[in-house]
Amino acid sequence: MMASLATSISGSFRILVKSSSTRNGFPVISDQNPSFVLFANKRRHISRTAIFHRSAISGSSQGEKISPLASGVSSGLYSAQTFDLTPQNVDLVLEDVRPFLISDGGNVDVVSVEDGVVSLKLQGACTSCPSSSTTMTMGIERVLKEKFGDALKDIRQVFDEEVKQITVEAVNAHLDILRPAIKNYGGSVEVLSVEGEDCVVKYVGPESIGMGIQAAIKEKFKDISNVTFTS
């Protein structure tokens, strides 16, 4: 006599188990659907075949790129996946946020992770703009809380010391936050001169990143109002 039991398991799996008694082996179940995986466990008189069906995980459609800072949008990592709270994992999760910060002339660095408290430093245009608190609270904090859950006790913003002197070396050092992204696009950036309100920069790369460079320099160095590119 054939007995069947269907059980629905929460998550992305469904299992259907069919059992039958037989003397000459076990029943053969044929299914042409590649989303089914068959597992057979033969016994002397009883055989069981379990069919696991993995529900399809819907992905975002190709096309316009949506910022993970937007409400209701999870990061590129699976939203169900959580991580141990370490500096390396915090940095990994923030990789989904950085492209959007960099496009606005900013970035974020992980300063420390201690006793559930994550200290971050916003860079470039994100540092002192009026929306910096919104960026931290509505964007970065939301993504981190989603990935680290109750292990994350607090997120603190660390601020840079006030810039006292504007030099070519100081501006170049500040642009280090953008150089990895520029290099990924096959570009380069170097500050050639700083004279009063004028800053001349040798830049090769995408126009969108170039606008971010200009914003990063002006936000950090308030006395610079003109940033000129040369190749």
Curated annotation (Swiss-Prot):
<dbReference type="GO" id="GO:0016226">
    <property type="term" value="P:iron-sulfur cluster assembly"/>
</dbReference>
<comment type="function">
    <text>Molecular scaffold for [Fe-S] cluster assembly of chloroplastic iron-sulfur proteins.</text>
</comment>
<keyword id="KW-1015">Disulfide bond</keyword>
<dbReference type="InterPro" id="IPR034904">
    <property type="entry name" value="FSCA_dom_sf"/>
</dbReference>
<comment type="similarity">
    <text>Belongs to the NifU family.</text>
</comment>
<comment type="subunit">
    <text>Homodimer; disulfide-linked.</text>
</comment>
<dbReference type="GO" id="GO:0009570">
    <property type="term" value="C:chloroplast stroma"/>
</dbReference>
<feature type="transit peptide" description="Chloroplast">
    <location>
        <begin position="1"/>
        <end position="69"/>
    </location>
</feature>
<keyword id="KW-0150">Chloroplast</keyword>
<dbReference type="GO" id="GO:0009507">
    <property type="term" value="C:chloroplast"/>
</dbReference>
<keyword id="KW-0809">Transit peptide</keyword>
<dbReference type="GO" id="GO:0005198">
    <property type="term" value="F:structural molecule activity"/>
</dbReference>
<dbReference type="GO" id="GO:0051536">
    <property type="term" value="F:iron-sulfur cluster binding"/>
</dbReference>
<dbReference type="Pfam" id="PF01106">
    <property type="entry name" value="NifU"/>
</dbReference>
<protein>
    <recommendedName>
        <fullName>NifU-like protein 1, chloroplastic</fullName>
    </recommendedName>
</protein>
<keyword id="KW-0934">Plastid</keyword>
<dbReference type="InterPro" id="IPR001075">
    <property type="entry name" value="NIF_FeS_clus_asmbl_NifU_C"/>
</dbReference>
<dbReference type="GO" id="GO:0005506">
    <property type="term" value="F:iron ion binding"/>
</dbReference>
